């Protein structure tokens, strides 16, 4: 699907989640795969929970179907020998096809409820992407990016303004590290202001820094833009 969610298509988001763990290929390249290769297939018109993408890539012989009837297949991880059949099944061209030795699961039957990095429990999701529903999907992904355990200001005061600033950052192609750098500058300004006795200005700079600390994390999660240096920079 060409529809973007927070500036990323479904394919771009999946590729960022998996990184170097997989080698992207098209349907035309399936015939070139080695016999011992495995293939991970995703429909490009769905938004996938990050945990499902990672789990599917790490679990061979698995077909992911939606929970709602008629339980269409939306993703699969199969041996190369079954790639063509799995592709037809996920594409909807062969709804009744069977894949020998492949387990069928749905988001609700896969136990991935605990998201360690975000310190919260939430069922994994697979949602259809449409142009009309893109704003709702962006809100869903933004809400999902919040930690279950956080401070009261971050939980209740920052979400609405943070979402607007994240949207501006995506539009202006700002990176999370650039937002973090702006927060670091504000820390220095706050320290200088407190040293000079300008407590009001220093306090304002400090609060703005805490706001940007929320923004950079949300921007990183909704756009899947992160790096190890950036992780340490943020902390």
Annotate each language-model stretch with its function.
Residues 1-30:
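N-terminal glycine-rich phosphate-binding loop and ensuing alpha1 helix
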Residues 25-26, 171, 221-222:
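Transmembrane helix-loop junction
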Residues 29-38:
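Active-site nucleotide-sugar/metal-binding loop of Leloir-type enzymes
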Residues 35, 47-122:
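Conserved core of the sugar-phosphate nucleotidyltransferase
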Residues 39, 45:
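Short aromatic/hydrophobic "clamp" motif used to bind/position activated sugar donors
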Residues 120-204, 211:
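Topogenic membrane-insertion module of multi-pass membrane proteins
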Residues 204-235:
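Acidic (Asp/Glu-rich) catalytic motifs at the cytosolic membrane interface
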């Amino acid at each position: 699907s060409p529809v973007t969610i927070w500036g990323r298509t479904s394919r771009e988001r999946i590729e960022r989640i998996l990184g170097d763990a997989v080698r992207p290929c098209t349907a035309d390249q399936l015939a070139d795969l080695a016999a011992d290769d495995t293939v991970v297939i995703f429909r490009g018109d769905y938004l996938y929970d990050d945990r499902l993408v990672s789990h599917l890539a790490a679990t061979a012989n698995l077909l992911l179907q939606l929970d709602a009837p008629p339980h269409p297949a939306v993703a699969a991880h199969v041996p190369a020998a079954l790639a063509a059949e799995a592709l037809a099944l996920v594409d909807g061209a062969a709804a009744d096809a069977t894949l020998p030795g492949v387990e069928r699961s749905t988001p609700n039957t896969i136990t991935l409820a605990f998201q360690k990095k975000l310190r919260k429990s939430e069922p994994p999701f697979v949602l259809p992407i449409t142009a009309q529903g893109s704003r709702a999907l962006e809100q869903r992904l933004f809400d999902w990016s919040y930690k279950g355990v956080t401070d009261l200001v971050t939980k209740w005061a920052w979400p609405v303004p943070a979402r607007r600033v994240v949207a501006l950052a995506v539009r202006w192609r700002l990176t999370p590290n650039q937002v973090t750098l702006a927060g670091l500058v504000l820390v220095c300004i706050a320290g200088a202001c407190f040293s000079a006795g300008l407590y009001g200005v220093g306090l304002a700079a400090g609060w703005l820094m805490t706001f940007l600390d929320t923004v950079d994390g949300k921007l990183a999660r909704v756009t899947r833009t992160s790096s190890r240096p950036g992780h340490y920079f943020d902390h």
